[in-house]
Amino acid sequence: SRLLLNESGEGKVRFVEAPPERAPGLRSTGMVTGALWSDADGDGWIDLLVTHEWGPVKLFRNEKGTLVDVTEKSGLDKHLGWWNSITGGDPDNDGDIDYAVGNVGLNTKYHADPGHPVILYYGDYGDEGVKRLVEAKYENDEIVPARGKSCSTKAMPHLGKKFGTFHQFASATLPQIYTSECLSESVKLEANTLESGIFINDGKGGFSFRPLPSTAQSSAIFGLEFVEVDGDGKLDLYAVQNFSNPQFETPPFRGGLSVLLRGDGKGGFTMISHSESGLVVPTDGRALACSDLNGDGRPDFLVGINNGELLAFTNRRTPSAGVLRLQGEGGNPSVAGARVTLVSKDGTRMQEVYQGGGYLSQSTPTICLHSGVTRVEVVWPGGSSSSHPVDPATRETVISVPE
């Protein structure tokens, strides 16, 4: 992974790779699947969150221009997953940013918990002189192979000589098959959390994990987006699902139709039925972006399908209350990195402006308002702040960076 510094000048675009000391550990962070720039601890400096396959969601805290890995300190290190995606929002209305993360779900042949993770080894296990991948799992507190004798022997023929029958192979533990010495010299990766969920922020950059409802665990989640869809001022969550092409011995992760979850304003969610929402995506959903496609002030969705046509869903039910657009200048016209507090008689909710997130996606950098919003308070990327009244009769409210 690389951190690129923008050193563009007038009429010339130029990015330069940052020296390693600007982001220690980022180059070798692991198998990255997604990233989000967000102020996780509310100190005014934009931090970096990175999702991994076979690893945690890592937090690199921005300490005055240097990204420092504080994953362990934040509590994120406890949850190793096959994380696919990440987006930020304030579903519990407490003024800090929480993070929704997509994972493989609970409707697969894989099962894991903190004491019994699924495991992946990478090393040399025989006389072929080639490094191999070995999947492993727990059975009755013993580590055993996740793959059978036939495919294992095809990859490593020496196992056919060591285990003459299927019964012998099936009765052996992983160290008996590959030796403890070879396993100890291998790269070892684990996943102990397979649920998709929300990392709830304590306001200081510390996190606790809250799984999404069981209906959201029916399939792997990729694109996901916090959005207020029903006009009650509480953030909801929409996610697209499915993965049809695991290795041939594994059934497809294809039990989802996408999932729309209604937020309760306290960080909890309940399922909205597909018949009510009209959001049905039975194929392999990947990218998800939110935008006002028809200019009616309501949030709509664009869904990218793996090997399929782009889908568009227009919102017909949310009460239209207009949108907020921040107007920047220079190299940041959409004011990415701004933090906006929506103020209503029922309380406040924090929202950030992103330039990308979810699963390889970028939503329109506008904020859909609900009818109760009377004022917005903006913390601009440079650190200045301003407060602005909102007219509910205005279709689009535009606020420019103060001079």
Protein language model annotation of sequence segments:
Residues S1-W37:
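Solenoidal tandem-repeat scaffolds enriched in leucines and small polar residues
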Residues G42-T51, N93-G102, G231-V240, G295-G304:
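Acidic/hydrophobic-patterned starts of short beta strands in beta-sheet-rich repeat architectures
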Residues L5, V32-G42, W83-N93, G102, ...:
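Beta-propeller blade termini
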Residues P20-L26, K73-D77, A136-K161, G197, ...:
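Surface-exposed loop and turn segments in beta-propeller and other repeat-based domains
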Residues T66, L106-I119, D127-E128, E135-Y138, ...:
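Gly/Ser/Thr/Pro-enriched helix-cap/hinge segments flanking short amphipathic alpha-helices
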Residues D69-Y121:
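Conserved, well-structured beta-alpha core segment at the onset of a catalytic domain
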